[in-house]
Every structure is written in C-alpha cells, then in structure tokens.
C-alpha cells in the first residue's frame, strides 16, 4: 500500500480464507470499532466444534438474538472458506436454517467433509438460538 496511513476494512471483508486476512505482510490490526447499537440489546453466544487432537475448528457459530424484535444473526466460520453473516427477521425454523446454506460452499478437508461441516454448523446454529430464546446457557465447545 502506498503510504502508512491507517485504513478501515469492514468486518465482513477482513478474513478472506482459512487463516488468511486482507492484512499485507508487516501490517498489524490496531483497532476494532463496534458501534454500541450493534451490541445492545442483542443477546449473544458462541459455539465451537473442533477436532480435539488438532484444535482446528470444524465449525464456529456466534449467535445474536434481539428479544424485542425477534431478529437473529449468525456469524458462521470454520466450516466455510471465509466467515459469513446469516440474518433472519424472526427465530428461524430448522428448514429456514438449512435453506440459508444455499449458495455457500462448505470446506472439505482431512478434518471433515463438507456434508459433516454443514450438519455441525446447523446443529450449532439451532443450539445457539434455542439457548438465547429460552435464556439458558449450554456448553460453548463440543
């Protein structure tokens, strides 16, 4: 990049592939700005399934639920080439979650097939929203 001036990148564009970001050699992430309106009154949780021997994630799901509006947002990573935001206007059904995967390509490697990663991602999404909607808390890692 010409010059050393700070620049801004949207969170959705930051990670480009597994273990790859938009940062160039020598660049350092110095600041993350999250608007307060993006944090409250959302309730959130984090779910992760990993290969225990290696510690690599099969799937990561961050769920955000807005109790007043019933909106739901899922940040999905680990199972896809780069993280994705999946949004719903109301608590989704199992079928709606499955349909949200249309057009997404799940990773297939020595840690898990694409079908396995898709299944685990869906299970973590379902568990995350069930816990938030019922105000309970389950395990974060499986």
Model segments located where?
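C-terminal structural segment of proteins
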Residues: 1-142
